[in-house]
């Protein structure tokens, strides 16, 4: 079991918590992390890019001039890719970029990402973050005390107060435990787990 110190929002030690070694002390395999991140980013692509081929461009039905006798190069359509205003050859068409990654691989990658932050000592467990009111300055004050610079905060439940207070702060993101993903863990240098989210994460990855 991995033992981590639990702090309050004043960065005072409040206790210890045991983290499952099967989740937070997994050997990291970069190729698996790369695969899952690539799948995540591919799934986010809209894939709506499109150009018109010669079959899509309007017009071009009539032969511009007769086949022989003019001295000009033969032409069958003024929408040929060779012509100005003609169609595009092999241009991008709408497509789905997503590809399947097995559930076991996705879960393993999430464990590896968590283990990576734990091994780097960039995993912080906070008992809770409670602000007196919805104000950015209150969150910034807590972030400065905790030394958060580029941090992903994981909460057990959605907190509108916390979300609204931190949305104008750059390089900080709030997620609930069920939306935790490999890309965001690797994108943000610090991983801050609210104590209530830890057991939910372990139950999800068990």
UniProtKB/Swiss-Prot annotation:
Superkingdom: Bacteria
The protein's name: Large ribosomal subunit protein uL4
Keywords, alphabetical: Ribonucleoprotein, Ribosomal protein, RNA-binding, rRNA-binding
A matching Pfam family: Ribosomal_L4
Subunit relationships: Part of the 50S ribosomal subunit.
Location of the region described as Disordered in the Swiss-Prot/TrEMBL record: 48-78
Similarity remark: Belongs to the universal ribosomal protein uL4 family.
Highest classification ranks of the organism: Bacteria, Pseudomonadati, Thermodesulfobacteriota, Desulfovibrionia, Desulfovibrionales
């Amino acid at each position: 079991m991995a033992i981590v110190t639990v702090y309050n929002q004043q960065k005072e030690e409040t206790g210890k918590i045991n983290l499952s070694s099967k989740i937070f002390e997994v050997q990291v395999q970069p190729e698996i992390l790369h695969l899952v991140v690539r799948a995540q980013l591919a799934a986010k692509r809209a894939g709506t890019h499109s150009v018109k081929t010669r079959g899509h461009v309007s017009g071009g039905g009539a032969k511009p001039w007769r086949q022989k006798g003019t001295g000009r190069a033969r032409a069958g359509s003024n929408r040929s890719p060779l012509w100005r205003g003609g169609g595009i050859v092999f241009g991008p068409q709408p497509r789905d970029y997503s590809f399947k990654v097995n559930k076991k691989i996705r879960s393993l990658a999430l464990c590896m990402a968590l283990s990576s932050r734990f091994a780097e000592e960039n995993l912080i467990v906070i008992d809770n973050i409670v602000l007196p009111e919805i104000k950015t300055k209150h969150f910034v004050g807590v972030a400065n005390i905790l030394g958060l610079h580029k941090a992903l905060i994981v909460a057990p439940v959605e907190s509108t107060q916390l979300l609204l207070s931190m949305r104008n702060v750059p390089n900080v993101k709030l997620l609930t435990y069920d939306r935790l993903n490999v890309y965001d863990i690797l994108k943000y240098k610090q991983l801050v787990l609210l104590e209530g989210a830890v057991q939910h994460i372990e139950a999800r990855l068990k």
